[in-house]
């Protein structure tokens, strides 16, 4: 096994283990694109893990600076994740410099004190999942002004879904991502009741979450304009990944209280069903690039 093959084996293992939602879409891609996207995901995950980890803030900043510097000499690296990413960038137009935006988003996470309004939240989302969307597009293709905008918008929609899904978990970790002006306008103050669930005696939090979920749905409408521009297998991947998050968003829109005491998730079977439906609906979108995956019926346990 070559160094590059071993590197991809590692990044694909990281993706299979950690990408509990994205993996269902990624596995619909042909082998070369699947491997490249696993390399992008693995480095994105490393950056995110630094920001979300237990290290002291100054240590996190040092770690992120080290990652940023490592990208300057990526072709000479022996780090398996960077070896795989460098190879992916030789096969596809992956903009390595764009990972700096992802690191900037992680720096925002370290210094997070909340956001003043939705515009400020969008800056955060754009540097995070919006950047991931554009990195994925570099592998899906084709890259244009329009498709880059759609990919960014779709990433922003996914991150808004995460914020609503994880509102309690984030609050327990001392973080609030809901815009302050919207919290103030509706008179919402996040707190826990005696059972440890988010307290909402007057339904104001539910009203804010439903409003936010409706807005996120609008961002999906913008971002999903990307799909007709993609080849069949890339379209299926994109539709599967976004479809899983849209299912979660639909649960929140229907009953915001569902996130008051837990972090909602779809079962592995439901995620596999979403992926299968995405693949089936992509049949009329154009020619596939490569044979269909033989393992469609299998899915990770998470």
Swiss-Prot record:
Cite the GO molecular-function annotations of the record. 15-cis-phytoene synthase activity; geranylgeranyl diphosphate synthase activity; metal ion binding; squalene synthase [NAD(P)H] activity
Pathway assignment reads:
Carotenoid biosynthesis; phytoene biosynthesis
Instruction: State if Manganese is listed as a keyword.
Output: yes
SUPFAM superfamilies from the entry?
Terpenoid synthases (SSF48576)
The record's EC number reads 2.5.1.-
Keyword Cell cycle applies: no
The record's InterPro entries line, in alphabetical order, gives: Isoprenoid_synthase_dom_sf, SQ_synth_HpnD-like, Squ/phyt_synthse, Squalene/phytoene_synthase_CS, Trans_IPPS_bact-type, Trans_IPPS_HH
Keywords of this entry: Carotenoid biosynthesis, Magnesium, Manganese, Metal-binding, Transferase
Q: Some GO term, biological process aspect, for this entry: which one?
A: carotenoid biosynthetic process
EC class of the enzyme, as a word: transferase
- CDD domains referenced in this protein's UniProt entry, alphabetically: Trans_IPPS_HH
Q: Which cofactor does it need?
A: ATP; Mn(2+); Mg(2+)
Q: How is the cofactor bound?
A: ATP is required for the transferase activity but it does not seem to be hydrolyzed during the reaction.
Please indicate which superkingdom the organism of origin belongs to: Bacteria
* NCBIfam families given in the database record: HpnD
| Function per UniProt | Involved in the biosynthesis of carotenoids. Catalyzes the condensation of two molecules of geranylgeranyl diphosphate (GGPP) to give prephytoene diphosphate (PPPP) and the subsequent rearrangement of the cyclopropylcarbinyl intermediate to yield phytoene.
Q: What family is it from?
A: Belongs to the phytoene/squalene synthase family.
Q: What is this protein called?
A: Phytoene synthase
Provide the species name.
Mycobacterium bovis (strain ATCC BAA-935 / AF2122/97)
